[in-house]
């Protein structure tokens, strides 16, 4: 019995030791597992932050982290939106100047092109109007300077009218990176843009100056020789303008809405500038005639000017409809956004502009007798000028100020400033030389022009 109890006690002791050893082994294993788990957690934290967050912040803590991240993103998005809104508000004074400058540039540039056409086509009927065209053409200088200065200030981020000028817009990884605009940096780069802008300025002003210079020299010299010189200048200029009329429209206007493009835009802008310049030519000519000057201008000249204004109002409308209809019918997202913004935010000026640029002037001078009545033609010219200012307004303002637009002292002041400069330059040029281009080889034809 004692031996049995001893054996039983020995077995119990052995069992207890085995249990302790087993427990220690399990404890060591658990400790090793915990250490391995911790080490794995540290590695996972270095490799994938989201996985570590799930391990280290389970349940409510993880939800709090997600909510915090979403709140941070919302704040960042709000800050970016607020900054964009602030830029649009700050752009308004610059945009008001820019719209007026572009509009008055068109009044001179359209007549510079028309003046060149008179020499290339050897036109005789318009010889008595050339001095007015020359004066109007030279009025491009002041608005052109303002356009270039405002554009170049965008490179220094003085304003934010041109989205493609934003810092880092073409740098991969930059917060402002835009892959679509980055693809266009070959054309829309500060250096290339500046080179093109200077070429426009030099080429256009050179043509205006040379046509004026040779015209004045003909008053005291050989009129035929000077006329032939001007034919050469005009031929070179019309080819130059055929290219730059489109590229300048892309640079100065279409690049404001950098993502959007239209292959008709150059023609569309040219048509608007051209018809506006005829409206200005009509008003200046009738003003001078009303003051007792230019007695050689008769109702036939007025009729022809009215026909040009009528014809290019229809041409402008054709281009407007072609551009709008093709974009609307295709319904491509990157194209329709241009018109969606104007429908949503600029609906009133958008549709009023169509009425002023097409319906009213066409109805006013549709008949032959109406084109010969000064009062009717003046009214139609007024519609055209107001309408095409609104056209430029609708082209430029949505991309620069968004829905922070209006017509107040800024816009009115810009119009009055450039109108004053335009009138001053034109009347000063007219006062410096005889209104009649007396040695022009076709001046007699112009004096007795009939149709």
Question: Model segments located where?
Answer:
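Hydrophobic alpha-helical transmembrane segments of polytopic
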Residues: 104, 108, 136, 140-143, ...
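Juxtamembrane membrane-water interface segments of multi-pass membrane proteins
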Residues: 115-135, 150-165, 209-230, 252-261, ...
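Aromatic-anchored segments of alpha-helical transmembrane domains
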Residues: 243-247, 382-393
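Membrane-interface transmembrane-helix boundary segments in multi-pass integral membrane proteins
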Residues: 263-269, 334-354, 402-426
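Extramembrane terminal tails and long inter-domain/linker segments of multi-pass membrane proteins
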Residues: 1-89, 159-186, 212-230, 293-300, ...
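Transmembrane-helix bundle segments that line or gate the permeation/cavity pathway
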Residues: 2-11, 101-219
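Long, contiguous internal "core" modules enriched in hydrophobic/ aromatic residues
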Residues: 33, 39, 44, 48-53, ...
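Hydrophobic cores of alpha-helical transmembrane segments in multi-pass inner/ER membrane proteins
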Residues: 108-113, 145-146, 197-209, 271-286, ...
